[in-house]
């Protein structure tokens, strides 16, 4: 039940690192008990892993976790992360630029998530969606099928009466349902030869993801319904 909030998320994180962003989301939104449970559950699962397979666990945490290149094909259009975007722009060392973008993205998502959470109601759903987008953006590898958050934004936006959220839903529908990231030749580093406008469409998820965070972080009041309040 309620006592498992945070623990379940961090247990999932130990099996797959992508949900780990939500442990930070608990902190940003002031859900401190859930954050503590997430931290405790995470440390417990790591300890169990070391007890069961010490050598494999050590290799994973000290080597494999920090070497995404082991997955191969990181310039592939299917890698819809900020790192993938940079690799397709300049096929070389982009670590410093990536770290700066990751920091900015985390701040942006944190501001948006906190403001939306404090708004209560449907805004708390959008707060969670901001965390999901941030996780996909900052991960070194985010395959296109990780971007289920786009589908959730479509559903949430169409169910929301506010114009900003509805526009975001339409933009995400255009980006995802048209499969525009696959419109051009992909694989075997063919993405590197694409023109600038082809790269923009190929990196649709990252660009729309950042734009969504900006729109929601500016001020949640600006995403209110376009209907004016009655004059007195």
Regions found by a protein language model. Name each.
Residues 11-26, 138-146:
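Transmembrane helices and adjacent periplasmic/lumenal helix-loop junctions
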Residues 1, 20-21, 33:
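Internal amphipathic alpha-helical segments of the cytochrome P450 catalytic fold
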Residues 7, 17, 126-127:
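Short hydrophobic/aromatic segments of transmembrane alpha-helices and their interfaces
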Residues 26, 155-156, 160:
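Active-site catalytic microenvironments for nucleophilic, acid-base chemistry
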Residues 1-6, 11:
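Single conserved hydrophobic/aromatic residue that forms the stacking wall/gate
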Residues 158-232:
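Aromatic-enriched
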Residues 29-147, 151, 155, 192-198, ...:
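Primarily membrane-embedded glycan-assembly and transfer machineries that use lipid-linked glycans
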């Amino acid at each position: 039940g309620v006592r498992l909030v945070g623990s379940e998320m961090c247990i999932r994180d130990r099996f797959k690192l992508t949900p780990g962003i939500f442990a930070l989301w608990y902190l940003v939104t002031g859900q401190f008990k859930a954050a503590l449970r997430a931290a405790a559950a995470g440390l417990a699962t790591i300890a169990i892993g070391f007890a069961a397979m010490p050598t494999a666990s050590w290799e994973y945490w000290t080597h494999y976790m920090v070497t995404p290149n082991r997955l191969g094909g990181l310039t592939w259009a299917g890698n819809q992360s900020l790192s993938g975007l940079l690799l397709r722009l300049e096929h070389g060392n982009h670590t410093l630029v990536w770290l700066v973008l990751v920091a900015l993205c985390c701040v942006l998502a944190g501001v948006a998530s906190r403001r939306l959470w404090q708004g209560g109601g449907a805004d708390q759903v959008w707060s969670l969606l901001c965390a999901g987008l941030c996780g996909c953006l900052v991960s070194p590898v985010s395959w296109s099928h990780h971007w289920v958050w786009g589908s959730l934004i479509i559903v949430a936006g169409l169910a929301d009466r506010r114009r900003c959220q509805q526009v975001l839903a339409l933009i995400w529908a255009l980006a995802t349902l048209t499969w525009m990231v696959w419109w051009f030749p992909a694989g075997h580093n063919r993405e590197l030869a694409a023109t600038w406008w082809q790269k923009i469409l190929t990196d649709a998820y990252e660009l729309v993801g950042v734009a969504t965070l900006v729109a929601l972080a500016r001020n949640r009041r600006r995403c209110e319904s376009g209907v004016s309040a009655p004059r007195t």
